[in-house]
């Protein structure tokens, strides 16, 4: 979404993305659950005597440090969502415009500062110096930052991508249904992210999608940006696609045959759902 913001000068609020992503995600999750239940048919016999209350009792009650941390976390999430929500009803209000101008990075940074300042039992909620020095993967952070700028460069007028698409791509797709164009982009994003990294996929595909929309007007800029962001995160297959998939490949309870079989099924279904449901929702936002 940062690529869209860099290219257009406008932002997509987290609330807007949630309106797009939650219904789409729920439908995909339901499809995946049905596939697992009806086709994979896993053995749930070991869960018959599983006692949830026993696990909760072992955790014990939350202490003050945990409660304050949870409060700051949910406050941050609310501050991410509320500006976009208010913008739907009172878009011209000065304080709403001010809240939306900050972006999600400001509130995330503010929450880190708060947790670094708030001290309980003479210890801050988080040790910022320790986290910065030992727990932040600076390589990944720099890679993501470069990726966002790379995506915005694709959309920039100086690179000539928009002019190329307007001159050569626009005539080719002028008579192609919009949903077909979106479906092709969605499939490209899903297949690319499952064999490469999601960051590079989202960067490239969002950049191309926005450039296509700006040069031809065939696709809705907001909707296509959310489609490529969602599809670029739909990792199901290869270890390189996402950390959780890499963990799944190394888990004793899963096999590569299962991962490939059901992963490919989801790779084929995800673009269809995101295009038919997600893109349609995105054009309304």
Per-segment meaning from a language model:
Residues 5-71, 85-90, 226-285:
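Juxtamembrane and boundary regions of transmembrane helices in multi-pass small-molecule transporters
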Residues 1-7, 163-167, 199-212, 225, ...:
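Re-entrant/interfacial helical elements at transmembrane boundaries that shape
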Residues 10-23, 59-64, 89-106, 130-136, ...:
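Interfacial loop-to-helix junctions that mark the boundaries of transmembrane helices
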Residues 144-145, 173-216, 221, 228-229:
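Hydrophobic alpha-helical transmembrane segments of multi-pass integral membrane proteins
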Residues 101-106, 128-164, 179-194:
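Core transmembrane alpha-helical segments of multi-pass membrane transporters/permeases
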Residues 39-40, 82, 114-122:
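Structural signal for the C-terminal ends of transmembrane alpha-helices
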Residues 26-31, 65-76, 92, 97-120, ...:
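Hydrophobic mid-bilayer segments of alpha-helices in multi-pass membrane transport proteins
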Residues 75-83, 143-164, 213, 223, ...:
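Hydrophobic alpha-helical transmembrane segments in multi-pass integral membrane proteins
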